[in-house]
Amino acid sequence: MLLVLAGASGFLGTAWRDHLAREGHEVVRLVRGEALSANESSWDPYAGRVDPEVIERADVVACLSGAPLAHWPWTESYKKTFVDSRVATTRTLAEAVAASDRKPAFLAQGGVAGYGDRGDTLLTEDAPTDADTFMGSVVRAWEAATEPAAAAGARVVVMRTSVVLDRRGGPVKLLLPVFKLGLGGPVGSGRQYFSTISLRDWLRAATFLAGREESRGAYNLSGPDSTTSADFGRVFGRRVHRPAVVPVPAFVLTTLAGTVSSELLNSTRVEPARLLAEGFTFEHPTVDDRLAAALHQDPSSTGH
């Protein structure tokens, strides 16, 4: 499989690129600067420019581009950057796929914020994504940007990705020193549902969807169990041999998401219904499995 990948230098992009190479697939990275090797191709998503020959050769085009959520300060200017870095990049690639003769499959990153604060309601891919929040509006615009490819008849997959757990990036990297100091615990009340997936399972799920011709539409990339913030904090604390009773400090939330940090307190109980129905199996089905993998521990142990 030849996969053309935007966002290949980020946390998920770097890991997926390495995973695909180990699985025997070829990856061409889209880069904003000059292409320095045969497996790179220059593009300018904001000008709508991408090499049509690269798209024509691809079996799959994938977009993981996006400015990081963990940023401070969250100014109005950064909010625009956050949105454009997702929507404009996705739309440019969707239009390139639509304009191609071969019509490669198109995989686009997305999120679960569109579901909003839904308490203990189990959220499959059929649940409404009408959350009246900043992040909800971002996710809807992000998914809508794939429409040119779908309208042209290409196979389009939107990966509604929950929180990916690994110590090399994302919230685990930020929370680990907090928990090691004994300052970790639930976020907010602890009663809200907090959907997560291990990095390994995300990589496997993305590769599964890229290679499966029957897969199209939106998929929840989240672990199959339902975990509250309190459960997550308790397991995290046990994994690092520290108490986990103190609510996560506000500065951690602000560092994670700036002025939209309050949205991290939403309860979003996501179920990967379509992945499970199509036969995907999780290597890390529980939050304990996922945190053991994220911390590079033996899952049968209780910590280091």
Feature annotation, model-predicted:
Residues 140, 152-154, 165-174, 209-219:
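Glycine/proline-rich active-site loop of Rossmann-fold NAD(P)-dependent oxidoreductases
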Residues 209-259, 292-304:
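Mid/C-terminal beta-alpha module of Rossmann-like enzyme folds, strongest
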Residues 3-23:
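N-terminal Rossmann NAD(P)H-binding glycine-rich loop of SDR-like oxidoreductase domains
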Residues 90-132:
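Conserved Rossmann-fold NAD(P)-dependent oxidoreductase catalytic core, especially the SDR/UDP-sugar
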Residues 176-184, 192-226:
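Alpha-helical substrate-binding/gating segment
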Residues 35, 39-89:
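NAD(P)H-binding glycine-rich loop region in Rossmannoid oxidoreductase-like domains
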Residues 131-156:
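Active-site Tyr-X1-5-Lys
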Residues 262-304:
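C-terminal amphipathic/interface module of NAD(P)-dependent oxidoreductases
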